[in-house]
């Protein structure tokens, strides 16, 4: 079943911030950075007095602490041992660094306390951010691009310091992070971004939205019945995982086609928009193909990394038909069979929930 190839060929890989703009942000860890499973204690601690500090071991020769699984939040370093950052949420910050050496532990400081929901592992975050080497150059920022960045935390898709430090923060917050090497790019560094294996890296992050891994389209969207001639049955309430069945009289599609199942109240999509979607698919012979929806018995932190996937409404692709569809909607995407050097891929019926525009 090659639906994932058909979809993923057009899907934007999870934005790991490494390939954005000219620089590189919190990309996935390498094999040497085996700290991607690090967690956060159930108690987020208090950030109002300064910073949170992740407990760490100091096994040589790692040039920074190794964050153990399920690390507890340690006592913060004094505030004057961390950089200061100018600006309000939405404004590009500027760092001023102290003359002291970087702290050897993961530090988090709440610069502006938000009032939204708490971020949980497995959530997708929509953010603005700026990353800079301690006392050195800026290697990436979204403010100059004037475009937010989305990524999933707690599942090993970003550097471990982000996986750990984002959890427990409230939406609407601006935070400062200081990541020693083991919590960033480890001893390997990131040569493309100009980050050495001994560098501490710091970030300001504006957390604008948090999207749970099981979030679908709008539960109160306006339903739209399928034409009877479609001979495809879609079951399940709006906003939760659906199911789809191809009837015996259904005509196999010869081109990509989108049929509305509900109309959300969000913004209309346009070509080149990036969006988060949930999808559930079957082949034209009703064989289960692929789904982004987390399993019903999945752990709360969503360790498998399932959940919304980011795609581009790209011209000359099946997703081009999503242009004009509103965020919050549910649609049925019919994909014809295709042939390639790898063989033939069957026709598919895909239920897509448009979760958010990023």
Which residues does each PLM region occupy?
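Cross-family detector of peptidyl-prolyl cis-trans isomerase
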Residues: 2-358
